[in-house]
Regions:
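Phosphopantetheinylated carrier protein domains
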Residues: 29-52
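Hydrophobic N-terminal alpha-helices or hydrophobic patches in metabolic proteins across all domains
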Residues: 69-181
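Glycine-rich loop motifs involved in handling phospho/adenylate chemistry
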Residues: 15-27, 47-55
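Thiotemplate assembly-line natural product biosynthesis machinery
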Residues: 1-16, 64-67
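Charged low-complexity stretches with an acidic bias
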Residues: 57-70
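Short alpha-helical elements of helix-turn-helix
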Residues: 3, 26-29
Length: 181
C-alpha cells in the first residue's frame, strides 16, 4: 500500500517545492492513512500535519464540517443542474434504479474532486437539465460527499419526505438533512 501511494504521489507530481503533499480530495487523504511516515499535506490552501494517523478520521470530520459551510451558501438559491442520471436510469455500478433525476452543478467542485451532486425532487419525467431552488443539504456523516436537494420554486418538502425520496441511495450512508428554518 505504502509503495503504491508513493508511486501515485510521484506519478502525479503532487508535491510542492518544499516536499509538501498537495491534495484536492479528502479521498486521497484517506489513502495516506496507512503510511508510517509523517507528512505535511496541503488541502484547500491549509497545511495539515499528520504525525499520528490514528487521528485522521477526526481531522477529516473537522474539514468536512468546514466544507459544509460552502454548501450552506446554496440554500434557497436558484441553481442550474445538469442531469447525468435520469429518472429510471440504472446506477452505473450498483443494482438499483434512480427514482428521481440526479445530476450536478457544472463548474463546481466537491470533496471528491467532482462537481457538487444534486437530487431533483418533484419532477416526474426524465430530464436533461433543470433549474430550481436548493431546499436542503444531505450531509453524509460517514462519507466525503454531500448532496443538495433542488426543487421547483413552488415546491417544498419536509425532512421526512426528503429522507423517503432519497432512501434508494442514501440508505447506505449515515446522513443528516440540513434545511433553513
Amino acid at each position: 500500500m505504502k509503495k503504491n501511494i508513493l508511486k501515485i504521489l510521484k506519478k502525479n507530481k503532487i508535491k510542492d517545492e518544499e516536499e509538501n503533499i498537495i491534495v484536492d480530495s479528502l479521498e486521497f487523504i484517506r489513502l495516506i492513512v496507512d503510511l508510517e511516515e509523517s507528512y505535511k499535506i496541503k488541502f484547500d490552501d491549509e497545511d495539515l500535519i499528520f504525525e499520528n494517523f490514528s487521528s485522521i478520521n477526526r481531522i477529516i470530520e473537522i474539514i468536512k464540517k468546514r466544507k459544509l459551510l460552502n454548501y450552506k451558501n446554496y440554500l434557497n438559491q436558484k441553481i442550474k443542474v445538469k442531469v447525468d442520471r435520469k429518472l429510471g436510469d440504472k446506477h452505473p455500478e450498483y443494482e438499483y434504479i434512480y427514482s428521481l433525476n440526479y445530476g450536478y452543478i457544472p463548474n463546481t467542485k466537491s470533496e471528491d474532486g467532482e462537481e457538487i451532486d444534486v437530487y431533483i425532487l418533484g419532477e416526474f419525467d426524465p430530464l436533461e437539465e433543470f433549474e430550481g431552488v436548493c431546499r436542503a443539504i444531505i450531509y453524509r456523516v460517514d462519507d466525503i460527499e454531500n448532496k443538495l436537494i433542488v426543487t421547483a420554486e413552488d415546491k417544498k418538502y419536509s425532512i421526512d419526505q426528503i429522507k423517503a425520496l432519497v432512501e434508494f441511495q442514501e440508505r447506505f450512508f449515515k446522513t443528516e438533512i440540513i434545511m433553513e428554518k
